[in-house]
Curated annotation (Swiss-Prot):
This is NADP-dependent malic enzyme, chloroplastic. Homotetramer. Gene3D superfamilies: Malic enzyme, N-terminal domain, NAD(P)-binding Rossmann-like Domain. It catalyses: (S)-malate + NADP(+) = pyruvate + CO2 + NADPH; oxaloacetate + H(+) = pyruvate + CO2. The gene is ME6. Its cofactor is Mg(2+); Mn(2+). The chloroplastic ME isoform decarboxylates malate shuttled from neighboring mesophyll cells. The CO(2) released is then refixed by ribulose-bisphosphate carboxylase. This pathway eliminates the photorespiratory loss of CO(2) that occurs in most plants.
């Protein structure tokens, strides 16, 4: 062990100018004299023990030969840090106040060329930036110009993610100001391709990864996340990403994209958002054989092993972040999605966007479409192609709204809704073989195996596609819908675009321009007989950002179905006669933050009414309160 005197001598030598030059005046790149090397060896030993006092002497004190060899490497590399090995690590120091070079690489505080002259002097930025000082608006204009040069959507996505990693406020300012143009870039449909290629385009981790390797240590993994005041978590296990299937760990693009929209559209602070991927393996052989795959290379865990990890995760979230953190389940396979929602809805603040979010936005579209086609919700007949999470979730919310309006039992209201899965129409004769979540939708009817036969037999006024299978709304099907409906309501909801049941152009052309159409993925306006039809997009982004904000500002501890109905009814009221005349049953996204504030106010009001809110007293004007709580991405001035 070094004596206290020797340690002090070594520390003083480290601060001396002789540290950087030999006695003979040699430069710092040279090896220096023997005595200087000895001083450096002793100073290095002091630093090692200061950083890790419990290290054994054999690690702290290196042999002279080893040290001399490392000094040669350090001299060539240009610094003491190059002397580090696995046995003698360096400490990754971080400063409490970012300045200079560090500040420019901090995405939470970086402003690029928008740093003022005063800020450049105060934070040691002078010379690290070109002389020009520009506004945030000009930065937005420049980036939009650059993005429009890319012809491939994935290139735009990568450029946007790169911006988010460099300058967080500029990213959200860009997205908010150009939401209609950039929404398809940061989310569907482009995010689907990004997830498929996530391993290849992976640059920097975003979010938190919890894998089977972390079993028994999930609490510690969550503690590694730097933020503590988390309000919204979006979590996926990657088994059913959009309509693309099992993408394993590469499904992280979905939670990242969703939470970007929570901030941009709903105003939830970025630091309060946490994207998480639960990696339990993948059954996708292509990914397992892909050298760039970033997840566990094993078959997907199921049963007890899977549910034990999820139980540990849910318990850890509640322990660290409390019971008022909203946990949004995203893109879980049917068999897990329904089980997880049923299991945790009574003990946690949970929300499944594929089941509940999709249902809420589609119900809003249906309520809005009634202003075009006439009648009440109970007077229409509904046929779904697809009986998974989305299909059954929408069907249940329709039945709940009908029950609310008519005061009829929910079982009676379900009879207005028919579902068709891969084996045909869901009828009573199939009840024994049906999964539990499909059984409420089995009605008395003869077996029907094809969609066209079901349409001709049931004669629905509303046809909704949630199958994930493209081109299933054929010309014959849409012509049949148009033959007995003056204004057939056709929702082609599957994502991405390639999986859509039909395109907007097909729906309008095959119905002679009479269809009331909405889709899950965006479509361009369609001209038919001289009239421009603007297809509405039944995008969950209308609902979940405002819904989440409403939960946050009310301090709700549980999600109730009446809160979903309140969100639907509020969104339905936002579409105007001008929108209807253009053919759209949804309002434009240009006003989405105002819409989100109104939805948040409705959701919060319902939470207070149901006794689920904990943030007391209740604000007098919930809409104004919601707006005041929303994150704005304008630059802040620095001292």
């Amino acid at each position: 062990m070094l004596s206290a005197r020797a340690a002090a001598t070594a520390a003083a030598a480290a601060a001396s100018p002789l540290w950087k030059r030999g006695e003979g005046g040699s430069s710092g790149s040279g090896s220096g004299c023997t005595s200087c090397r000895e001083v450096r060896r002793r100073a290095a030993a002091v630093r090692v023990r200061a950083a890790a006092p419990r290290r054994v002497e054999a690690v702290a004190m290196e042999s002279a030969a080893e040290t001399e060899k490392k000094e040669e490497v350090a001299a060539a590399g240009g610094g003491v840090e190059d002397m580090a090995t696995e046995e003698v690590p360096v400490t990754p120091w971080a400063f409490s106040v970012a300045s200079g070079y560090t500040l420019l690489r901090d995405p939470h505080h970086n402003k690029g060329l928008a740093f003022s002259e005063k800020e450049r002097d105060a934070h040691y930025l002078r010379g690290l930036l070109p002389p020009a000082v520009v506004s945030q608006d000009l930065q937005v204009k420049k980036i939009m110009h650059n993005l429009r040069q890319y012809s491939v959507p994935l290139q735009r996505y990568m450029a946007m993610m790169d911006l988010q990693e460099r300058n967080e406020r500029l990213f959200y300012k860009l997205l908010i100001d150009n939401v209609e143009e950039l929404l398809p870039v940061v989310y569907t449909p482009t995010v689907g391709e990004a997830c498929q290629k996530y391993g290849s385009i992976f640059r920097q981790p975003q979010g938190l990864y919890v894998s089977l390797k972390d079993k028994g240590k999930v609490l510690d993994v969550l503690r590694n996340w730097p933020e503590r005041n988390i309000q919204v978590i979006v979590v996926t296990d990657g088994e059913r990403i959009l309509g693309l299937g099992d993408l394993g760990c590469q499904g992280m693009g979905i939670p990242v994209g969703k939470l970007s929209l929570y901030t941009a559209l709903g105003g939830v602070r970025p630091s309060a958002c946490l994207p998480i991927t639960i990696d339990v393996g993948t059954n996708n052989e292509q990914l397992l054989n892909d050298e760039f795959y970033i997840g566990l290379r094993q078959r997907r865990a199921t049963g007890k092993e899977y549910h034990e990890l999820m139980e540990e995760f849910m318990s850890a979230v509640k322990q660290i972040y409390g019971e008022k953190v909203l946990i949004q389940f995203e893109d879980f396979a049917n068999h897990n999605a329904f089980d997880l929602l049923a299991k945790y809805s009574k003990s946690h603040l949970v929300f499944n966007d594929d089941i509940q979010g999709t249902a809420s936005v589609v119900l809003a579209g249906l309520l809005s479409s009634l202003k075009v086609v006439g009648g009440t919700l109970a007077e229409h007949t509904y046929l779904f192609l697809g009986a998974g999470e989305a299909g059954t979730g929408i069907a249940e919310l329709i039945a709940l709204e009908i029950s609310k309006q008519t005061k009829a039992p929910i079982e009676e209201c379900r009879k207005k809704v028919w579902l068709l899965d891969s084996k045909g129409l869901i009828v009573n004769s199939r009840k024994e073989s049906l999964q539990a979540f499909k059984k409420p939708w089995a009605h008395e009817h003869e077996p029907v195996t094809t969609l066209l036969d079901a349409v001709q037999s049931i004669k629905p006024t509303v046809l909704i596609g949630t199958s994930g299978v493209g081109k299933t709304f054929t010309k014959e099907v849409i012509e049949a819908m148009a033959s007995f409906n003056e204004r057939p309501v056709i929702f082609s909801l599957s994502n991405p675009t390639s999986h859509s049941e039909c395109t907007a152009e097909e729906a309008y052309n095959w119905s002679q321009g009479r269809a009331v159409f909405a889709s899950g993925s965006p479509f361009d306006p369609v001209e038919y007989n001289g009239k421009i039809h603007v297809p509405g997009q039944s995008n969950n982004a209308y609902i979940f950002p405002g819904f989440g904000l409403g939960v946050v500002i009310s301090g709700a501890v549980r999600v109730h179905e009446d809160m979903l109905l309140a969100a639907s009814e509020t969104l339905a009221d936002q579409a105007t006669q001008e929108n209807f005349e253009k053919g759209s049953i949804f309002p434009p996204f240009t006003n989405i933050r105002k819409i989100s504030a109104r939805i948040a106010a409705s959701v919060a009001a319902k939470a207070y009414e149901l006794g689920l809110a904990t943030r007391l007293p209740q604000p007098r004007d919930l809409e104004k309160y919601a707006e005041s709580c929303m994150y704005t991405p304008v630059y802040r001035s620095y001292r």
